């Protein structure tokens, strides 16, 4: 029964992300609109690489270890890209001047994160990488996320639509960290990925709301 529930939820999430992403991209007449569309598609399509093999693994009698591992690798990279887009969406939305230190930090952390994800020690293809390497590759990602959370937090009163954006990003990381640290020894912690995904859906809804408000003006 758990498999059916998870599969239905994952399909709904992917459809929401891809459909709204296409909508935002099609309706995006300014830079921010296009950035929100691309970010949403990167999120949805990136997650599909590990969610689709996981769904198939529930119902097809075959070994999906390698596809699941490759999917997790791709998702790790696309999630990093998503937060790069979140930085540029922040810049466009709040009309802030370029802060070179923050910009360089975001890009440097993203490059380090992706480089760590590509290390053979991750053993993506056999799905038996250590918890230690999992924690190490996520350190720059969490720092990157903390910067994005801070930026949206300090500007939360400047935009009614995005006022809760920092909360959704913060919660997504709070649900994600226990999975990285303890899911290999306590599989039940993997259930935290469900509320993490709900946070992503809420972020996508804010993008959609922002675009709807712009079109109404």
PLM segments and residue spans:
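Internal transmembrane alpha-helix with an interfacial aromatic "cap," most often the third helix
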Residues: 21-25, 51-64, 70-104, 117, ...
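Membrane-interface helix-boundary motifs at transmembrane edges
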Residues: 25-36, 91-102, 127-129, 153-164, ...
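Aromatic-anchored segments of alpha-helical transmembrane domains
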Residues: 44-48, 109-119, 170-181
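A generic, lipid-embedded transmembrane alpha helix
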Residues: 39-56
